[in-house]
């Protein structure tokens, strides 16, 4: 049996649908979770979907993915711009890592244009709202050779 794709979402993403919907869209995190699970199922895969506002929890889950996941999709949110510890954890993985953002960081404030996570990512999907997660699932599925 193929291991699941782990999908991690960072700080403030629990507020999707209500926090700056003009930037992040109206979909809630539960909506995103359902869309990810449905997209993975079409490819014969499952998803472990988690969110935390705490850097240490995200790092623990990245480390868990080393043995429990076939690929990792991560929306690091603000930690992407600040967390070398998260980068170091991601560098320990030997599975595809897809960085995912709802908005396009390159089209936003200067401080959002650099992400440490990109240094460890296989690829990046950004700017498509909640569909960014689905596109990241699709990319991960392709990289692991799913149906």
UniProtKB/Swiss-Prot annotation:
The active site is at 24 (proton acceptor), 101 (proton donor). It catalyses: 3-dehydroquinate = 3-dehydroshikimate + H2O. Pathway: Metabolic intermediate biosynthesis; chorismate biosynthesis; chorismate from D-erythrose 4-phosphate and phosphoenolpyruvate: step 3/7. PROSITE patterns: DEHYDROQUINASE_II. It holds the Pfam family DHquinase_II. The record marks 19 as: Transition state stabilizer. Substrate binds at residues 75, 81, 88, 102-103, 112. Keywords: Amino-acid biosynthesis, Aromatic amino acid biosynthesis, Lyase. GO terms for molecular function: 3-dehydroquinate dehydratase activity. Its EC number is 4.2.1.10. CDD domains: DHQase_II. GO terms for biological process: amino acid biosynthetic process; aromatic amino acid family biosynthetic process; chorismate biosynthetic process; quinate catabolic process. It is an enzyme of class 4 (lyase). Catalyzes a trans-dehydration via an enolate intermediate. Homododecamer. Belongs to the type-II 3-dehydroquinase family. This is 3-dehydroquinate dehydratase.
């Amino acid at each position: 049996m193929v291991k699941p794709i782990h999908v991690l979402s960072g700080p403030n993403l629990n507020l999707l649908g209500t926090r700056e919907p003009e930037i992040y869209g109206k979909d809630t995190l539960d909506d995103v979770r359902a869309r990810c699970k449905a997209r993975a199922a079409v490819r014969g895969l499952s998803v472990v979907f988690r969110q935390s506002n705490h850097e240490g929890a995200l790092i623990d889950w990245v480390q868990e993915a080393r043995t429990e996941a076939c690929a990792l999709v991560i929306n690091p949110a603000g930690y992407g711009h600040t967390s070398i510890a998260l980068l170091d954890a991601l560098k320990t993985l030997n599975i595809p890592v897809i960085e995912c953002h709802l908005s396009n960081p390159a089209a936003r404030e200067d401080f959002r244009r650099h992400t440490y996570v990109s240094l460890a990512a296989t690829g990046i999907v950004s700017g498509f709202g909640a569909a960014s997660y689905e596109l990241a699932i699709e990319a991960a599925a392709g990289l692991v050779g799913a149906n």
